[in-house]
Regions:
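Non-catalytic accessory regions flanking glycosidase/transglycosidase catalytic cores in CAZymes
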Residues: 1-224, 229-238, 262-263, 267-304, ...
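Active-site His/acidic residue clusters
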Residues: 242-257
Length: 501
């Protein structure tokens, strides 16, 4: 049995968690919107056409904010097409994903849906085929009280009160040659700065997110971030990161080490942000919005066979297995370990498209990745302790030395709770883990939840929705005696130990 130690001190803190770190993402792509969150005429939908079963599962996740409407989609998005009477909304070819967009679900419907889901809106503007003027008009439509053309247009559409959207993405993945309106870093930095400036003239309370690199593998990574921030540092508030991981090679150990790659990515971008700050003698700090992250590879081959120019095809519909849930758990731990700088994060996406929730005409179900996301969202709120992990390591093909144990501790001082999240990545050995918690006098173990399965490829389906579900560990798996925690984490398992006073 492997052995490891978790070291925490309640006076050594990483930082408070921003609840938006548990955000998600809905794009007009595949069946994310149509048949996912919206299906008019379905017996499962409410009077607005919103799938009630989907809404219930989204509420279970406690998603604080949802990014919309893209994604690559936003770089060709004409927001005016998506508002007003549905009979007057045009259908258009959607170039990002090669489909037909009917615009029967649009901006106002999404705001209504978000309110029912208990989420705020993170709105993206089109800086691909459009620019600052259109972004300003969209903000006027959403946030201005009245007495102007676009605010009165919103009222005419039945929305008397402003939507009051305060978080805005300045385009999407503008470094990518696949993007409509793709730009160089200097071109994008300039238009992002001017767009943010106009938007803050209109509503000084809005926050803006500039596009960072589409992934760590982009050839322009590093220089892109530096140049964009050099142009836009004073106007923007966050810089975005996007990253997906896959296991097409079937090398599980290397796949599970991907969280180390994510950690390196975040650390690198933080360094670049601070380098620009130093150069500019800046006072404010640019924080990060990791607004696309997940596992994505299962659907790649199937998507090559899709017919083009159809409506709402089965696109990017990854069926997630147990090992995917392990990595998602580790990625959430990684985000929390950077809570001092990562203030926003969005699992991409939320329903049907590389998503924790899947739907059919007859129901909705939770994929394997749903569970670490839900439980971390529920209990990973408070202050992240500077969690040191003394763990055995292994050599991964892609990321070099990787830890067998990923872990982070979150302390909610007001509620007197301490939650330990941990992933044992060893494929063949349980792990005995100790942690000195004598500073947390009076705390007792509330529960030890474990997500585990003998079959790394086990998945949840509509027919078998509970193949992979978390369970309570036996009392022998975790004990607290004299302020010292001793726990056993099973091989290839995700764990959550909750303590409270």
């Amino acid at each position: 049995m492997k052995k490891a130690q978790i070291i925490v001190d309640k006076y050594f803190l990483t930082g408070k968690t921003d609840k938006r770190i548990y955000g998600s993402f809905i794009e007009h792509l595949g069946r994310a919107v149509y048949e996912g969150i919206y299906q008019e005429g379905s017996p499962l939908s409410d009077e607005q056409g919103f799938r009630q079963d989907t809404l219930e599962l989204v509420r279970e996740l406690q998603v604080p904010i949802v990014r919309y409407p893209g994604g690559n989609f936003v770089s060709g998005f004409r927001w005016e097409d998506s508002v007003g009477p549905k009979t007057q909304r045009p259908s258009r070819p959607e170039l990002a994903w090669g489909v037909i967009e009917t615009n029967q679900f649009g901006l106002n419907e999404f705001v209504d849906w978000s309110r029912k889901a208990g989420s705020d809106v993170m709105m993206a503007v089109n800086l691909g085929t459009r620019g600052p003027e259109d972004a300003k008009n969209l903000l006027e439509y959403c946030n201005f009280k009245g007495g102007t053309y676009y605010s009165d247009l919103r009222k005419a559409h039945g929305y008397e009160q402003p939507h009051d959207i305060k978080l805005w993405c300045l385009g999407n993945e503008m470094d990518g040659p696949w993007q409509m309106g793709h730009k160089t870093a200097a071109e994008y930095g300039r238009v992002a700065a001017e767009t943010a400036r106009l938007m803050k003239f209109m509503d000084p309370e809005v926050e803006t997110v500039a596009c960072g690199s589409s992934s760590l593998e982009m050839p322009t990574f590093g220089s892109w971030e530096y140049t964009v921030l050099d142009e836009a540092y004073d106007q923007v508030d966050y810089l975005s990161l996007h990253q997906y991981y896959g296991n097409a090679s079937g090398d599980t150990a290397d796949f599970l080490a991907s969280s180390k790659g994510m950690d390196d990515f975040i650390s690198g971008v933080v360094s670049i942000c601070d380098a620009v700050k130093a150069k500019k003698h800046g006072k404010k700090q640019i924080n990060l919005s990791f607004d696309e992250w997940n596992v994505w590879y299962h659907s790649n081959e199937q998507d090559k066979k899709l017919e083009k120019w159809v409506q709402a095809p089965h696109q990017l519909e990854d069926v997630y297995n147990f090992e995917d849930a392990l990595l998602v758990g580790s990625m959430l731990i990684t985000l929390l370990r950077h809570a001092d700088r990562v203030k926003i994060a969005c699992m991409a996406q939320l329903v049907n498209v590389i998503a924790p929730i899947m739907t059919s005409d007859t129901g909705a179900w939770r994929q394997t990745i749903f569970y670490p996301y839900m439980l971390t969202s529920m209990f990973g709120r408070g202050t992240v302790l500077n969690t040191q992990v003394l763990t055995p390591i292994y050599e991964s093909k892609t990321y070099g030395e990787a830890p067998y144990l990923d872990s982070v501790c979150v302390w909610d001082e007001e509620k007197d709770t301490l939650t330990i999240f941990a992933v044992n990545k060893s494929l063949d050995e349980d792990m005995e883990v100790s942690c000195d918690l004598r500073q947390f006098e009076g705390y007792k173990i509330v529960e030890h939840i474990v997500l585990n399965n003998d079959d790394l490829q086990a998945a949840n389906t509509e027919a078998q929705p509970e193949n992979v579900v978390p369970v309570k560990a036996s009392a022998e798996c975790s004990k607290l005696d004299g302020g010292k925690l001793e726990a056993v984490f099973a091989k290839h398992s995700w764990n959550m130990i909750r303590l409270a006073r």
